Design a protein with these regions (language model features):
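C-terminal, well-folded lobe of enzymatic/effector domains
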Residues: 102-256
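Short alpha-helical segments and helix-capping/turn motifs at coil-helix boundaries
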Residues: 26-27, 57-59, 183-189
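Bacterial N-terminal signal peptides that target proteins for export
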Residues: 4-19
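Cleavable N-terminal signal peptides of Sec/SRP-targeted secreted and luminal proteins
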Residues: 15-33
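Short, surface-exposed loop and linker segments with low hydrophobicity and enrichment for Pro/Ser/Thr
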Residues: 27-42, 190-197
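Generic recognition of well-structured, leucine-rich alpha-helical segments
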Residues: 28-31, 82, 127, 179
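Betabetaalpha-Me/HNH-type nuclease active-site subdomain
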Residues: 34-116
Length: 256
């Protein structure tokens, strides 16, 4: 004879199944995190290439990878920090391989033209090996964080564009505070007309992948309004053979 179950029993079983499915979806949707995430947090550094090209005397060059970098903020660092001391956790190993599939959003446009692999190797040796993540997960987590932040799209949606305009620091901060519930650290550099311009953004995430305000933010000098410098073709310095195609970013025709 089949056992009878009360409606409350079926209700409890349904709730338990819904909870398990919810947790499974959360795990699948989240970036990889370290096995022991209680004592660390992450810091992601994103550079605006227009400011870099403007301020460096060497100019910018087309990478030798054959893959054009995106017309967007580039990752320049992904650091693991001790949650107690706020010190970077570095130098754990230098023998672990790295993933070279980073050409668009962790691109190196420094001159002379290069394939970017030295910067990826340095990032892995300095910080990745200490992250508690595999080499593959370390780079994929950095790219996942960058994608979740989606800085240029968020800024443009609020009318903040790389058009030589001056934009308030508070307005830039508000874009990300309202979007990801975390305040970025803004690094400025000197640009045209002796104006400060947006150079890098730093974002922090807890060990579980949740964005947070950076616990020990670096202090940088900026003005109340900063310039958002364009990223134009004329800013790029070619150090390749003259027969090579001019620098182009995927899907976007750069203005002259």
């Amino acid at each position: 004879m089949l056992a009878r179950h009360s409606p409350s029993t079926f209700h409890m079983a349904s709730c338990r199944m819904a909870l398990l499915l919810g947790l499974l979806l959360l795990v699948v949707a989240s970036p990889a995190i370290a096995d022991d995430d209680s004592g660390i947090y992450y810091q992601l550094a994103l550079m605006w290439p227009g400011a870099y090209c403007e301020q460096t005397s060497a100019g910018c060059c087309k990478p030798t990878t054959g893959v054009s970098p995106a017309r967007d903020f580039y990752i320049t660092g992904f650091t693991v920090l001790n949650a107690t001391t706020d010190a970077a956790v570095t130098g754990c190993s230098n023998k672990v391989p790295y993933d070279p599939n980073l050409n668009q959003y962790w691109s190196n446009i420094r001159c002379p033209s290069n394939n970017g692999q030295s910067s990826w190797k340095n990032a892995w040796k300095k910080a990745g090996a200490c992250s508690g993540l595999s080499e593959k997960d370390y780079f994929e987590t950095a790219l996942s964080f960058r994608s979740r932040i989606n800085p240029l799209v968020r800024l443009k949606a609020k009318g903040i564009e790389p058009d030589f305009g001056l934009y308030g620091l508070k307005a830039i901060t508000k874009v990300f505070k309202s979007g990801i519930n975390a305040t970025p650290v803004i690094q400025c550099s000197k640009g045209p007309f002796d104006k400060y311009m947006l150079f890098q953004l730093y974002f922090c995430a807890a060990g579980n992948g949740t964005f947070i305000d950076c616990p020990a933010p670096q202090q940088y000098t900026c003005s109340k309004e900063i310039l958002f410098h364009p990223f134009k073709k004329w800013m790029l310095k070619q150090q390749l053979n003259q027969d090579d195609d001019p620098f182009q970013l995927p899907g976007v025709a750069m203005d002259n």
